[in-house]
């Protein structure tokens, strides 16, 4: 599993989407550093959820990752945070 500092220089998520998310939440002005930090955090979360979803599908004897694998993996990750 990669951590945010081990990811490639070509992020999977776009910076423009990070600006939109922050602005939708009420941010009037958003620094590039803030948008980039949100992108790094969300990519790390997505990587952790995806890793666990892959494990769940393998445990179920499937090669296909299903929506319920993602949902369960996200729920498990959120339960660890709280």
Where are these regions (language model features)?
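Intrinsically disordered, low-complexity terminal regions
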Residues: 1-82
């Amino acid at each position: 599993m990669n951590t945010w500092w081990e990811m490639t220089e070509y992020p999977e998520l776009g910076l423009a989407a990070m600006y939109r998310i922050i602005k939708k939440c009420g941010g009037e002005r958003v620094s590039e550093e803030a948008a980039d930090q949100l992108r790094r955090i969300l990519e790390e979360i997505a990587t952790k959820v995806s890793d666990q979803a892959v494990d769940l599908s393998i445990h179920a004897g499937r090669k296909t990752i299903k929506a319920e694998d993602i949902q369960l993996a996200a729920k498990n990750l959120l339960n660890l945070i709280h």
